[in-house]
């Protein structure tokens, strides 16, 4: 798939080492990772993040992820609804929540549904806030 989330992560994940600990077992716990906020071709937006303190699998920097954390989509997206943290609230706001451990397969379906990642717009906005 041209717009797979794993491909996007591979090309755009920024990792910063926060602590110079030489212990290789601690390395993944002392990093901060960040991905650009995704803008799709139809205007749908969402944050997708991976890393040691996030709802993603695996927890370390990896070549491929099986599940990612999604945050604050621009509109209610039924494909990811069941992973919403606030699903059991009386009136959940699906645009104001985090979605934990969303399978990559589902994220790719969301991207396809919304026309794929508009990489030009995604990176333009990322440069504005970086």
Task: Show the residue positions of the predicted features.
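Intrinsically disordered, low-complexity segments enriched in small/polar residues
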Residues: 18, 41, 49, 69, ...
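Amphipathic, interaction-prone secondary-structure segments
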Residues: 23-66
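Glycine- and charge-rich intrinsically disordered segments
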Residues: 1, 7-8, 125-129
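Intrinsically disordered, low-complexity, compositionally biased regions/tails
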Residues: 11, 24, 55, 119-120
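Acidic, aromatic-enriched beta-alpha/helix-loop junctions
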Residues: 52-93
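Low-complexity intrinsically disordered segments
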Residues: 77-130
């Amino acid at each position: 798939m041209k717009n797979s989330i794993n491909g996007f992560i591979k090309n755009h994940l920024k990792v910063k080492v926060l602590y110079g600990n030489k212990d290789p077992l601690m390395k993944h716990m002392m990093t901060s990772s960040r991905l650009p906020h995704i803008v799709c071709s139809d205007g749908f937006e969402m944050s997708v993040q991976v890393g040691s303190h996030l709802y993603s699998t695996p927890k370390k920097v990896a070549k491929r992820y099986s599940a990612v954390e999604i945050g604050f989509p621009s509109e209610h997206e039924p494909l990811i609804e069941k992973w919403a943290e606030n699903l059991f609230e009386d009136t959940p706001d699906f645009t104001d929540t985090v979605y934990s451990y969303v399978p990559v397969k589902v994220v790719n379906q969301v991207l396809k549904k919304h026309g794929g990642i508009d990489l030009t717009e995604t990176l333009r906005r990322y440069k504005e806030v970086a």
